[in-house]
């Protein structure tokens, strides 16, 4: 018996698409399959390039929140942090957006919330910027700018976090600028701002390879590292302390200097302009004579090396125009005075300029000579250097030949057993 195919008819009441066909059996069949897709909001965490990153604590990459109603409104379970660290990296919040395409302007509210649209553009993506740790460092000397050879010098390094990421694994070591005349420290005192100071031991090896500071430096904070070194060198030599610090940030360096004490004169560098070092003129004990006499400086081992070294005047200036004068006061004792005709004769003075002043590579260059300098003890100013006579440097030195320096005293002046003193006033005149 032949089987005639049955007509399969599928339609709907609202005249939507109809299906007509034939069923190969004698029985009428109708099958309808439904595909149900569960709509959800997926949370994503990416960097500025769109690459997925480790999310903040309390959040899950790819977490899905079901849309439970046709009017579902998504709200994040908690506020997004302004910054966080994960996996050794630091991130700062840039904003978030809804959907698949990143807009030009992100929404910056920290708790994302919005009405869903059920169109495949309901996911939430939070964008964070990966921060690069950066730091600055300074090195200062906390003791005097000169040190006796064999004496100690104390230094302080200040490491400051200049980025939006914490500084970690920080180390400090000597740099290539370190002068051999400075010994390695044996310990460091590390003090985070607002924290507790701790002592870190230092060896020759760690000073070369890097001393771990054992502390992190938060965003916007700093830490100080103080250490002491022994300085050894010749008189007047400049020694440089140079350090490098690094960690999860690129290495940065700083340096400072100290000068080995001069055997004869104090050296104190003015902040702006003035005198770095001035000489003393000591004529020792002289005899009262019946005629005018010129007396030389005293000879002593502790006074300009028994005459083997010269007194000098060293100045610092910043203005392009400068001149120098000097004047001598009347020599007086407790009960007597020498006449104002008394003279201090300094002779001609070679003038030198400096390059790389106060650096280990400091060079002194002779650039000229003054005329003969004779000061009369009546406080009259005598011109020493004329305006713009010497140019091209900010540090100059006048050297006075030890054997040329004389004190001229008239006949029969002075009293036995009296000590006479007078002041030489040096006047540095500068201007634009």
Please name every model-derived segment.
Residues 1-5, 120-126, 130, 210-241, ...:
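Low-complexity, intrinsically disordered segments enriched in Ser/Thr together with acidic residues
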Residues 1, 73-85, 166-180, 324:
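Surface-exposed beta-strand/loop patches in extracellular or lumenal glycoproteins
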Residues 10-13, 18-45, 103-133, 229:
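Conserved "repeat-terminator" motif of extracellular CCP/Sushi domains
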Residues 131-258:
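Exported/extracytosolic protein signature
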